[in-house]
């Protein structure tokens, strides 16, 4: 594929995606997937396993599409396309930017419920060579097209969860029936609740696996005009494959509810954990650990064109092993975005030169499920000897969707960025403002602009300068980073242009091995949670003829199907919101 043909896509601006404005159906443009053995255009850096999930690949005209396994409903196929704010499907535009690294497996299928276990991924290659052996399906349930909730019925491969026993449990049940649904789970206890749903501790019948199931009431969402928020969260979760972000194991719906099945984090959230610390604050070493993992998660989200917009300790969950996981994506903003690779020396000098393809692919570390589009200019192609191949400068991944704009007033008052309060429109820089508030709270035990009420808090955010108390004492590096993040003008805020790359290089994170953060020892390991009493009480309730009342929940407020005490104070110290 000639990269020169894509030079005009380098300056494509970020646009907020509106997934509910499809045009009239065009049955002739139904999407289909390429098989790895088909005549895929040859390219020395073409990797069908690492491509952009937002743009559909268009095969050569001579290539006949394989028989579709998704049915022939062209309207359903059209709903699978990604739509821009002007209503056009990005997949159907004739001038849509082509992507060298498109992966058909990252486009999640619409109506099929057949997929495969990540733990069996290594065996999948051998099975495909033998036509006599059938693949073991993994069923995640079908999606309905009503109420604007459309999308995938099964998850793509998640490389970092390849050995996850929860996938094995899901697959063992999926192989026995047509699809996974609410009847396959027992809801043991309500763990938390939020604006669009409640989260329950659930075990998968016939296995020893437990999950966190987010249940959203359809009628409540429709009456409060929040269907789009539920759809956004589900779509974003289906894209994620990162150790500090949640894995969507299954999605299904009933007549009354939408259900998302995710990982159960027994360690609670960082807000609760901070309350248990001496003086209700973390040490600088512990704060650096949690901030580094959150920073990597935000960087990955920005690579995908996702602005998180709801960072706060309550949304940072602690896994069993002590590492963190971001949660609650219903306020997030999706946009089209093309990350690029640049030389660090050029960025620092303001040159912003883009690397040529060969050096960028071979010399840059990138997430296992994402390979950014390479956008070389004429200058970098002609002056190949000047691209820094023989120098000591290392490449940087520029993954900051600075052009995206939203006018929504969303977030928690103490964490709202000034540009949101002023109604000026906001972009990815709001995540770096909230990251500064987050770091301040970890170190000081409170937020910097908190007032007597919400109105006073908003006034302080916009009009009051940042101040540090005399105690507790924090390092000058920590204060300097927080000052850079809490600049009220988003254009002057640290990381506005270079994103997480600039923050990683700050002295506060000196000594952090970013490639091995996942292997670092956490400052706190949660105590094991004994789930036996909940399961035993649940079985006792059923044996007394109570029936499976947890699977017959009423609309909002949802019934707390807890096996045991029903008061909220008795719940496990865990919130998903």
From Swiss-Prot:
Residues 185-509 form the Protein kinase domain. Keywords: ATP-binding, Kinase, Nucleotide-binding, Serine/threonine-protein kinase, Transferase. Residues 1-12, 69-87, 110-120 have a biased composition (Polar residues). Residues 510-577 form the AGC-kinase C-terminal domain. Pfam families: Pkinase. One of its GO terms (biological process) is unidimensional cell growth. Transmembrane segments: none annotated. ATP binds at residues 191-199, 214. It comes from the Eukaryota. It is an enzyme of class 2 (transferase). Autophosphorylated and phosphorylated by PDPK1/PDK1. Residues 44-55 have a biased composition (Basic and acidic residues). InterPro entries: Kinase-like_dom_sf (IPR011009), Prot_kinase_dom (IPR000719), Ser/Thr_kinase_AS (IPR008271). Belongs to the protein kinase superfamily. AGC Ser/Thr protein kinase family. PANTHER family: FLIPPASE KINASE 1-RELATED. Interacts with PDPK1/PDK1. Functions redudantly with AGC1-7 as signaling component in the pollen tube. Required for polarized growth of pollen tubes. This is Serine/threonine-protein kinase AGC1-5. It comes from Arabidopsis thaliana (Mouse-ear cress).
